[in-house]
Regions:
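Metal-associated gating/positioning segment near the N- to mid-region
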Residues: 1-42
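Histidine/acidic residue-rich metal-binding segments in metalloenzymes
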Residues: 61-227
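C-terminal cap of metal-dependent C-N hydrolases
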Residues: 242-245, 298-344
Length: 344
């Protein structure tokens, strides 16, 4: 069966997450106040932050009612995983109904990506995947940075930067908007996966080793604000389709902290505090929410054992009932959340 909000909360809790940001892509698209209000009735100690749709249906043709969505509980406004027309963005920014609420836009031009599956490189050609040119990120990024110059008071966030060129452009930008990076892009690249790995099927497209190194460096230097999970769970009916036609995305909240710890702490020499800044405090900043704090008698804590070994498989306890598009199946993982105060 497919994922629902309750199974999502359960998975996030057992993986140590106390907050979830949910994008407006749903059925129906979350561009009406009713869809915000109905989700706000869910009782959970995991804090749910709902993004409202920037445009109706995520189609980028007509603005949604920004004021109504934000007044009724939307944490901010986001569109689909590609850039809407600049004119509709200008229209929304000029109206300024979002005030200080965050706006999340993906610097991705799907017309330039076409059917590209992996960022254009030698490894992409060797794997036999259709290439995704770097211009599919760079050209919309140029547009968004130019727009941000004219509307610097807008709390703009760039959804999931994925290329070395993108990091370089942000580093050199006079005015820097906040930006996220997908966790999977920090732990894998298109030189490290087998041709049959489900981890190829992500948006934005997986890049090269140089892209991955630049993303890690960009995070460390605070060019990038936060790490996103961007979980997109699917069941067997979708997961078993050929990679070039299946729905893009992977799931696996339980993998995020162990694999990031391995890559950023063990291999890249980060301090634990830096990792926490990028997976907790940075996301709070982007969402315009208060940072998590450890307090006496609080249940908002987790215990993580970086040496705990376990086997990643779809039979893994607490993670077997829904999504089947988890990567790295049947492999040993080092590091595990062994307890969380939010687990009932």
């Amino acid at each position: 069966k497919e994922e629902n909000i309750y199974s999502l909360i359960k998975k996030a809790t057992f993986a140590g997450y106390g907050q979830l940001g949910i994008l407006p892509r749903s059925t129906p698209w979350r561009d009406q106040i009713e869809s915000i209000i109905s989700m706000k009735t869910i009782k959970s100690e995991v804090l749910i932050h709902l993004w409202g749709g920037f445009s109706l249906g995520g189609k980028g043709t007509t603005l949604s009612k920004h004021t109504d969505l934000l007044r009724n509980g939307a944490v901010g406004l986001a569109d689909d995983d590609f850039i809407p027309p600049i004119e509709i963005l200008k229209q929304g920014f000029l109206l300024g109904e979002m005030k200080k609420s965050p706006i999340l836009i993906a610097p991705r031009d799907k017309s330039l990506q076409i059917e590209g599956m992996s960022r254009q490189s030698v490894d992409t050609l060797r794997a036999g995947w259709p290439p995704d040119p770097v211009e599919s990120e760079i050209l919309p990024l140029i547009q968004l940075l130019e727009l941000y110059k004219h509307y610097p008071r807008i709390s703009l966030g760039l959804m999931n930067i994925s290329t070395a060129q993108g990091v370089s452009m942000l580093k050199d930008a006079y005015s820097k908007p906040m930006a996220t990076v997908l966790w999977w892009h920090l732990v894998n690249d298109n030189s490290s996966l087998s041709p049959f790995d489900i981890g190829w099927s992500v948006t934005p497209s997986l890049g090269s080793q140089n892209d991955r190194d630049s993303l890690i460096k960009g995070l460390e230097d605070n060019v990038l604000t936060a790490i996103s999970v961007h979980s997109t769970p699917t069941d067997d009916s979708e997961t078993n389709r050929p990679a070039n036609i299946r729905k893009k995305g992977i799931s696996g909240y339980n993998l995020v902290l162990p694999l990031l710890w391995d890559q950023l702490i063990r291999k890249s020499g980060w301090k634990v505090e830096k990792l926490w800044e990028k997976i907790s405090f940075g996301p709070s900043q982007l969402l315009n929410q208060a940072e998590e704090k450890l307090r006496l008698e609080s249940n908002r804590w987790l215990l993580f054992d970086p040496e705990k070994e376990w086997l990643q498989s779809k039979e893994e306890k607490h993670f077997s009932s829904t999504a089947t598009n988890q990567p790295i199946k049947d492999k040993k993982i080092c590091g595990k959340v062994i307890d969380c105060g939010l687990i009932n």
